[in-house]
Amino acid sequence: MDKDAKNLTALEAERELEWLAKEIARHDVLYNNHDQPEISDARYDALRRRNIEIETLFPELVRADSPSYKVGAPISERFEKSVHAQAMLSLDNAFSSEDVHEFVERVRRFLRLPVTKTLEMTAEPKIDGLSLSLRYEKGKLVCAATRGDGYVGENVTVNARTLSDIPQVLQGDFPDILEVRGEVYMRHSDFQDLNVDQQEKGKLVFANPRNAAAGSLRQLDTRMTARRKLKFFAYGWGEVSEMPAKSQMEMVKKLKEYGFVINPLTKVFKAVEDLISYYHFIEEGRQHLDYDIDGVVYKVNDLLLQTRLGNVSRSPRWAIAHKFPAEKAMALLENIDIQIGRTGALTPVARLAPITVGGVVVTNASLHNEDYIKGLGSKSESIREGRDIRIGDTVIVQRAGDVIPQIIDVIIEKRPKGASPFVFPSLCPACGSHAVREVGEAVRRCTGGLICPAQAIERIRHFVSRNAFDIEGLGEKQVEFFFHAQDETLRIHSPADIFTLQKRQEKSLTRLENMEGFGTLSVRKLYDAINARRKIPLSRFLFALGIRHVGEVNARRLARAYQNYNAFETVAMTALMPCNKEDKGNEEWLELTSIEGIGVRVGKAIIDFYQETHNRDVLSSLLQEVTPLPEEAAVADYSPVAGKTIVFTGTLVHMSRDEVKALAERLGAKASSSISKKTDLLVAGIGAGSKLTKAKELGIEIMDEESWLQLINEHHI
């Protein structure tokens, strides 16, 4: 991450995105499920920001497991699952005043607000705690759930009822259904008392109030939660049967009327400069607060504008978190490990003696590639004044972002005698194949391909992962066990092997039930979990295949566009890419690449995947065992445009082009940029030209912008 993203080559960007996706996912699990973060929030934010920056510059390289489309982490198995009626999204981050100005300008452009139009924003401290959603029906608390992965959380209702800040019954005139979102936290004074008590009882102390709050709320013993003096600030909402307010601030005040505690520092401002001043005011005064904060959150105050702005994959367009600066610390570099990714990339990871930076325990840091270790940048320029990194060094670690921390320098004066330069392996540690670094690349890659167990195992892990086939009982350790099994009736080397496991076992004398870590009950549950996935939504199926650049979002786009697998496969097998500048490719190619978000790079990756004989063989075997189901509608049945392909052309007056496309997609339609026989509707603005003419020739339904808005409004959307 030392190199400016703008100067990255496509290959360098691809390698770094691979590392970011894996590390961010690992730390999401540590933070959300185990309450044991290894890095600071600032470091976590920096990595997420780096990921978004690279994806923005290289949209064609967005990965199937991109953290940009994920919120939180898959939930643990300690609590029952609770599905959020509305997704609990995360927030994009700002790290400077310039970022805040850009955010406000971005909002104005999306809404087409003139400079003279005032844009009110709320500002509030960003509480460093555990996000919680509280569902009330007829004024009574019926469910409390953690964020989880943003869509499904942990049901902690019994524990939440012990918090004095959470009303069991709402006060005043409240909606029939109300989901309140907020943050569970622990005051500094209560945190200190808790750790004193832990020490006296000979128990482990907590690293910081956030960990203590999260661990306390997720206790299996409710009495333990009740003793921990947890607090709750309400700041938002999810599903509401009837909105009682027109602005963010008005709604927050309503929450107070209902009986919730709101942060008294929440304010409304009309100018960006006032937001920045408020940020510095809070930053300077944070030491006097009795709870942890890690920034300031800005939100568009007008709820109608919030609705128009909508959301992107993992965050709302109408809010942003302005984070406080990073912190630094010295750490001892104990070792350097080499990890092998699904695509064969060799990634060095620093193992550090545990240190605490800003209350967060740090044990790992990325070393990016061999040049970075040598003290060289992406263009072979000197970094860190040429100081290389060696095992045994004392290094400067900066917490400023996402997944693992960043090593920014080496303390040469503390280098032990005899410390030798690190020799990057030229052979893959997993399979012994040559690790080749091609010209212009920063990363070495294993050439073992399918014979490399590390790569093959990662592919299977991806296939069974939470957002793909989501097969319970096939975690990392189990996948490794089955992959390395000596008995062929236990071996899993391809996706189809998963679904033939039970049949092979029925004819075997080597019983899985007798293996260490398994038993009759666990094996039965595993088979049930596997058989439950023999029918799966098309989007999950496509994502599970691991086609480069086809992440969760693109998989959903493809599934929505083609509805069934046969239609998708036909296009993937018959699409012909342009062979020269004059050639535009055949109709299937144009159809594929005209899907919103699916461009030339993604289309090429899909075609390349299906042209590979091995991939077709794997798919053929897999399709004998599983059935991809037509994609379910992403919106309610009453959406007038659900499932339709819409093209917008000409100049639109009331909404920006981005806004109408985003609205169409939220309503279950596919926004396309080109007219074809499969187009259902053309919305024509002022000055519509050739697309309007072609639509008339093809007999496609046409309406103007006013009719489009009327259609939407008639259905209360």
From Swiss-Prot:
Please state what class of enzyme this protein is: ligase
**Naturally occurring in which organism (per UniProt):** Bartonella bacilliformis (strain ATCC 35685 / KC583 / Herrer 020/F12,63)
One GO biological process term is: DNA repair
* Classification via PROSITE patterns: BRCT, DNA_LIGASE_N1, DNA_LIGASE_N2
Q: Does the keyword Acyltransferase apply?
A: no
**What SUPFAM superfamilies does this protein's entry cite?**
BRCT domain (SSF52113), DNA ligase/mRNA capping enzyme, catalytic domain (SSF56091), Nucleic acid-binding proteins (SSF50249), RuvA domain 2-like (SSF47781)
Query: Per the UniProt record, which EC number(s) apply here?
Result: 6.5.1.2
Q: Does the keyword Calcium apply?
A: no
Cite the NCBIfam families for this sequence.
Answer: dnlj, PRK07956.1
- What is the name of the gene encoding this protein? ligA
Which GO terms label this protein's molecular function in UniProt?
Answer: DNA ligase (NAD+) activity; metal ion binding
- Entry's family note: Belongs to the NAD-dependent DNA ligase family. LigA subfamily.
All copies of the BRCT domain together span 636-717
In terms of InterPro entries, this protein maps to:
BRCT_dom, BRCT_dom_sf, DisA/LigA_HHH, DNA_ligase, DNA_ligase_AS, DNA_ligase_CS, DNAligase_adenylation, DNAligase_N
What positions does UniProt annotate as the active site of this protein? 126 (n6-amp-lysine intermediate)
Positions that bind Zn(2+): 428, 431, 446, 452
Protein name (Swiss-Prot/TrEMBL): DNA ligase
User: Function of this protein?
Assistant: DNA ligase that catalyzes the formation of phosphodiester linkages between 5'-phosphoryl and 3'-hydroxyl groups in double-stranded DNA using NAD as a coenzyme and as the energy source for the reaction. It is essential for DNA replication and repair of damaged DNA.
Q: Which CDD domains match?
A: BRCT_DNA_ligase_like, LIGANc
Mind telling me which Pfam families this protein's record contains?
BRCT (PF00533), DNA_ligase_aden (PF01653), DNA_ligase_OB (PF03120), DNA_ligase_ZBD (PF03119), HHH_2 (PF12826)
Which PANTHER family is this protein grouped with? CHROMOSOME TRANSMISSION FIDELITY FACTOR 18, DNA LIGASE
